[in-house]
Each structure stands twice: as structure tokens, then as C-alpha cells.
């Protein structure tokens, strides 16, 4: 797959790369990976297996460790909580019950607290996962494969704006991150000037990838 090849090449160039594949929610709600034989949301995340979740997430491009990061990183959790409050009028709480970590949510205006179940809240799980890895400084390069999945265009645009705030080359500015976005959504095409066209590759079936070279722009 293109995303895995890209991850390999970037790793060889000494970037600390995190891939979030198009199937990143697997392990939360699917059984397509042998280790995740049942939903990790219905019963919670086994606290004794946190390191295993992280390793599998890194290996397969899964977002399973997102809630673990939120549990371990108060600074990131505070950011996510503030955004959930502003965007969705909801709060999130990470509860430890019987050796398992269970994320639970509640509407700000009242109502009972509820768990994030495997067959619902797709958009909520996506935005929480994407933002968590965006804010996590463990990696300085992230590949987002189809970040638009389950996201309303409004939140696609919001997420792109969050990416813009920290996008750059970490080898030049240590607090920046390098981003690669594989997408079918026009809301993730970040074109503000003709020079920005240099940053876009267009993939075709049975044809070579096309892109605009710097010399092409200079001619115009």
C-alpha cells in the first residue's frame, strides 16, 4: 500500500512516523486483525495490555491507543475536552473499572453518561482519535489516510486548520510536524497560492502519479 511505503521511506529519512490508516478504527469495532477478537469499546481497554495496544496500533496504523494517550497525557486530554465542549457540547471521562479503561460521554446540558459503543459515534471516535495523535508529540511526522471518514465537511475543515497550526519540517523547527494527507475530499486540499500546488500528488488507476514541479510554476 502507498501509505505503508511512504511510512517506510520517511522512517529511513529519520522521521518518527505515525500512520493512521483508513481502517484505523479497527480494534475498536472490527475483527479484521487477529489480536482484536472483539470490540475494545464494549468491554473497555485492558489496562494490563496498554503497551500491546500501542505496539499493534503503531504496526497496523490503528487508533486503538488514542484513549490510552488521553489517559496518560493530561495536557492533551485538556485540549480534547475543551474542543468537545465547544464543538459538540459534550464532556468525556475516562473511567477505570475492574482493570479496564472505559471512555464515557455526557451532554453538557444534562442527561445520563453513556459509553462510546462500537456501532455508533463514528464521527466522535474519529475526531477524538485524529486530534489526539495530532497533539501527541511522540512523533514528528503523521500520515493521515482518508481523514475525512465519518467527518462532516465542517469538521474536516476544522481539522485541517488544526493541522496548519503545527505543519512544518521538524528538522528545521523542532516544534513542527510533517503531515501527509491521503484523501478523496476537496476539504483537505490546502491550496492558498499557486506554489501550494507543489505539495499535491494526484494518483490514478493504471497511470503514473502526476504532480506539478517547481519549474512549471516558475514558468507562470
What annotation goes with each model-predicted range?
Residues 86-89, 181-183:
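A short, flexible N-terminal coil/short beta segment enriched in small residues
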Residues 90-94:
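A short linear hydrophobic-aromatic micro-motif
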Residues 2-88:
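Coupling/switch segment of ABC-type P-loop NTPase heads
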Residues 12-14, 89, 174, 194-195:
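Short, well-ordered coil/turn elements that cap or connect secondary structure elements
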Residues 96-220:
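Switch/communication elements of ASCE P-loop NTPase nucleotide-binding domains
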